[in-house]
From Swiss-Prot:
Name this polypeptide is given: Uridylate kinase
Enzymatic class: transferase
Keywords: Allosteric enzyme, ATP-binding, Cytoplasm, Kinase, Nucleotide-binding, Pyrimidine biosynthesis, Transferase
Region: Involved in allosteric activation by GTP, residue numbers: 23-28
Function: Catalyzes the reversible phosphorylation of UMP to UDP.
Catalytic activities: UMP + ATP = UDP + ADP
HAMAP family: PyrH_B
Primary localization: cytoplasm
Annotated GO biological process: 'de novo' CTP biosynthetic process; UDP biosynthetic process
Superkingdom of origin organism: Bacteria
SUPFAM superfamilies found in the cross-reference section: Carbamate kinase-like
PANTHER family: URIDYLATE KINASE (PTHR42833), URIDYLATE KINASE PUMPKIN, CHLOROPLASTIC (PTHR42833:SF4)
Organism: Pseudoalteromonas translucida (strain TAC 125)
Entry's Gene Ontology molecular function annotations: ATP binding; UMP kinase activity
């Protein structure tokens, strides 16, 4: 296997789930997980990779779950947006403590806490090596943070949207329930649909496919996995327009 000495991606959009930040806490944020992710992001910055970041809010609440309990969906989603801002504030602090310059931008105005999202300014910040955290989703209800990640990735012209998960990539079946499930190294957009594989919600996936935005899926709990994805090593699953049947037993 040939290992690239330079990153294969120049600019990336990293999507972290809110649940992943819980770690062993069960609710909220596990400081150890937060600091570890900040260090892994720092490694990318030191490789001159430009990093945009979207974090979910599921470690605090989910608008969809509140709607199922009877709350107005718009209100629930607004609360979910605020949860992503809380995670963004925490990550900004963790990155600053790791001596990484970053900026937090929110899709909804929150003067005094973070900047309002501005596409041109975000591009300028990325070019100067700052990490840009995009909070509050798309700023609209009924859209997931996966959709926000794909949207921001397309807007900032990222080379790939990297989704951090709790498993090693995209499997033929749920690896937790089925130990015989196979791990795919590379899939096309069409193969994802044909095999009915769950990567992200359909709106987000369709947005990425229609704009030919490659998707990378990796295990955020595996130390060094993010860097290996960036370096083009065999890690996780890459989803693009190119078809491949390669699987790892």
């Amino acid at each position: 296997m040939t290992i690239n000495r330079k990153p294969i991606f120049r600019r990336v959009l990293l999507k972290l789930s809110g649940e992943a930040l819980m770690g062993d806490e069960g609710f909220g944020i596990d400081p150890k997980v937060l600091d570890r992710m900040a260090q892994e992001i720092k490694e990318l910055v030191e490789l001159d990779v430009e990093v945009g970041l979207v974090i979910g809010g599921g470690n605090f609440l989910r608008g969809g779950s509140l709607a199922e309990a009877g709350m107005n969906r718009v209100v629930g989603d607004h609360m979910g947006m605020l949860a992503t801002v809380m995670n963004g504030l925490a990550m900004r602090d963790a990155l600053h403590r790791a001596f990484v310059n970053c900026r937090l931008m929110s899709a909804i105005p929150l003067h005094g806490m973070c900047d309002a999202y501005n596409w041109a300014e975000a591009i300028s910040l990325l070019k100067t090596g700052r990490v840009v955290i995009f909070a509050a989703g798309t700023g609209n209800p009924f859209f997931t943070t996966d959709s926000a990640a794909c949207l921001r990735g397309i807007e900032i012209e990222a080379d790939t949207v990297i989704k951090a998960t709790k498993v090693d990539g995209v499997y033929s079946d749920d690896p937790v329930k089925n130990p015989d499930a196979t791990l795919y190294r590379h899939l096309s957009y069409n193969e994802i649909i044909e095999k009915e594989l769950k990567v992200m919600d359909l709106a987000a996936f369709t947005l990425a496919r229609d704009h030919n935005m490659p998707l990378s899926v990796f295990n955020m709990n595996k130390s060094g996995a993010l860097k290996r994805v960036i370096m083009g090593e065999e890690e996780g699953t890459l989803i693009s327009s190119q078809a491949s049947d390669e699987v790892i037993k």
